[in-house]
């Protein structure tokens, strides 16, 4: 997906669909059945994934995420072509291809590279002061990752280091496999809010060119009953399309990152709180 993001090539739905349509035109004299068309589409998908791995150096997680969409897109184009090249005159068929190609190539011009945010919250049975002391930096998270993509190899948070509790303090959010997000504190309200900008992301193949994380934030709400609501947010921009598909995965991943960190904060805050 990195190459698609950097070069601004068409959506990973439209481009494979066009590929499937062209393939069905090439296959038309063979008159393949629907089953053979599906099998041929599977081979096309596997070849595309191998190309992504060896030519564009895409990560395994990225390829796993994109593979269902790629297969369905190629298959949709191939099945549409199977009907088109059976039913309509040759001249009409060929006149449609330039129009479809124009639509695919012009699709990137319609994109809005807007910023998105994902927010999660948990309840902690400890006062805000106890939670805050565990928030600004923390040691290695002892719990093994639960999210299946983390276990499959996607980098996950393991610790955070901070230069101090003040604005402009440098932070490091340390992920597995040596991935480090460098951050800078831009807003700090003791016992209430911590906001930091992400100034440098790791050059991980699962991340580069796919999305840009901009900033993160923790907000503490004192519930006046000895408990605290911890709210974690991340702002980001996606560089791959279709947005609805990749945003689904991105939000799912960010939510798993948030909850892994916040659940460890809760564990440490509640342990330090006498019962």
Go through the PLM ranges and name each one:
Residues 1-30, 34-39, 70-71, 94, ...:
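Glycine-rich portal/gate segments that line the openings of hydrophobic small-molecule binding cavities
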Residues 1-9, 14-21, 26, 30, ...:
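Hydrophobic ligand-binding cavity/cleft-lining segments
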Residues 23-31, 51-52, 56, 61, ...:
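Membrane-water interface at transmembrane helix exits
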Residues 34-39, 43, 47-52, 57-58, ...:
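Beta-strand/loop substructures that line and gate deep hydrophobic ligand-binding cavities in soluble
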Residues 67-89, 93, 236-275:
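A conserved amphipathic terminal alpha-helix motif
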Residues 121, 184, 217-219:
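Short, surface-exposed charged micro-motifs
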Residues 127, 177-178, 190-191, 223-227:
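Short strand-connecting beta-turns/loops that link adjacent beta-strands
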